[in-house]
Amino acid sequence: MTLYDENNLHIIKDNLRYLKLLSKQYPSISSASSEIINLQAILNLPKGTEHFISDVHGEYESFTHMLKNASGVIKRKIDDVFGTSLRECDKKNLATLIYYPEQKLDLIKKSEKNLEDWYKITLYRLIRLCQIVSSKYTRSKVRKSLPSDFAYIIEELLNEQGDRVDKQEYYNSIIETIIDIDRASEFIIAISNVIQRLVVDKLHIIGDIYDRGPGAEIIIEALSKHHSIDIQWGNHDIVWMGAAAGCEACIANVIRISLRYANLSTLEDGYGINLLPLATFAMDFYKEDNCENFKPRTIDKNLNETDIKLLSKMHKAISIIQFKLEGKIIKRRPEFKMGERLLLDKINIKEGTLNLNEKIYKLIDTNFPTLDKENPYELNERERDLVEKLTNSFINSEKLQRHIKFLYSNGNLYLKYNSNLLYHGCIPLNEDGSLKEVTLCKETLKGKSLLDKLDRLAREAYFFKKDPESKLYGMDMMWYLWCGSNSPLFGKKKMTTFERYFLDDKNTHKEQKNPYYKYRNDEKMCTMIFEEFELDADNSHIINGHIPVKTKEGENPIKANGKLLVIDGGFCKAYQPQTGIAGYTLIYNSYGLLLTSHEPFSSIHKAIVEGNDILSSTTILEHVSSRKRVLDTDSGEEIKKQIHDLEMLLVAYRKGLIKEENEANIRF
């Protein structure tokens, strides 16, 4: 560390106004010096553990468990601390207790014969484990993570060595008192939650919290309580964000997908969206239509025939409305270059055919009661009224708006963090592997500048309420991010929703991926992207989601010699037969990178009652001989800047450029 001297006085004088503001926080040489010492000490602590999860798709049970077990980190800590001194069944029970303390305690109280003895043994084990997981943090940081009820006691226990003779009696008496006053259960719950919190320093969610699963709102509610989180938006997130902003095409897509998978719990129970007007509309216009191609795809859902018929009619009704609303955007925004997706005007109702790319296809469904062949993209009066009601329902859902604001305040299209580049989908490329240029708002953009612009437009869609023109363009862009040909979130040439519903020919259903996916194994492509985002290619990784890794077919999630890692979480049950597993997560700790593959999760109930954990296997991707420290991280760089500023303040005090506060004034 080099302190400023007289040769640097001009720099100090240039920053004098800022330093005077800083002196309000550190009003003396003593306080500034103490802070420098504290910050320097933090730089030498081990780097905190980062946990990367992607593509949750609303599967809240699997996600909740993954969050609680930190992709096996807690289990590994138990192994490290207790080794062979505990039986495997005891380790498993201890892990389950930490994951689900309230529920597990209820079971133990019913089955344990000597509860006081069990409390004593368990408290010792939990305190020992908590001492280890808290050892890489400052006391101040640990203190902030402690529940107020037990903060003092936990801090005392964490910082005392129970095996020292002079402290053993003190240590034991605290534990015995906790049991004697009947607070053992509450203490176990508190310290288990502290372990869960401290075991992961930073959580990264790489997109697609929303989709077909039944509990996206439960997931976001849990994430909003997490101590340190960032989110890289996925295509399914962006369509919900667009819906919350009031984009009618996004609203139609969100409802259609929910009906397609018979998942109305998030819409109706989670967010209070009233779908009764849609049900009424569907029964009026599609009463005699069996809507065969719109029957919901269900997994583990018991629906009766009446429910299926109603959902099918609602599904078809909102799909036709969606195609009309999308057509309006395509016509309004020729720069999107999506004219080939205008299909309603290519329907010949009389012949029952579709003219697609100058080829005639037979439609498998020819009932279009709301389609005006002269103005196929116009909503009829009933449709317009319905769309207005649905839009009002989305805009006025307090919980939905709160959750979407959380996604905005904690999310981005991409993130650079500790030399890693995180994004959900892709960086749009040309066929030759070069960055694809896209024209938006009369600007030609590519790579980082494209993503930065799209990020800003996504925010304008939601926040520019007093600028209708900018808000409308932003909302249209939200829809484009969902399904546009150059969207970094979608990553395909087109979304063939219409063809899948109305054409039998499977060739028309194909969705061509962006060339990015062809080059994912190419180190040169990764190097190009690192340079574009101003990252060191030798020490960086791209961490990617979106496309499930087909492990059963031999696909490897480690691409480009370890430069690119695909961690599609595989939470979505529909993908698991294709992938063969329940996907991957990533851990980045002070020792290196660990990629963990997971088997499908049974249920939270089985995890609590039977101790069933997610079966996982871990691959060490990188291992460093010398542990990474805070010094080596982004937060370390920020701390170094703080030290630099405090050093300038010290010189300013010592040179008399700023006067120290009187000690008496500081105290009082």
UniProtKB/Swiss-Prot annotation:
Enzyme class at the top of the EC tree: hydrolase
Keywords from the named record: Carbohydrate metabolism, Hydrolase, Manganese
Cofactor or coenzyme needed: Mn(2+)
A molecular function GO annotation: fructose 1,6-bisphosphate 1-phosphatase activity
Pathway per the UniProt entry: Carbohydrate biosynthesis; gluconeogenesis
Catalysed reactions listed for this entry: beta-D-fructose 1,6-bisphosphate + H2O = beta-D-fructose 6-phosphate + phosphate
Highest taxon above the source species: Bacteria
GO biological process: gluconeogenesis
Enzyme Commission code(s) on record: 3.1.3.11
InterPro entries tied to this protein: FBPtase_class3, Metallo-depent_PP-like
Protein family per UniProt: Belongs to the FBPase class 3 family.
Protein name as it appears in the record: Fructose-1,6-bisphosphatase class 3
Natural source organism: Clostridium botulinum (strain Hall / ATCC 3502 / NCTC 13319 / Type A)
Gene: fbp
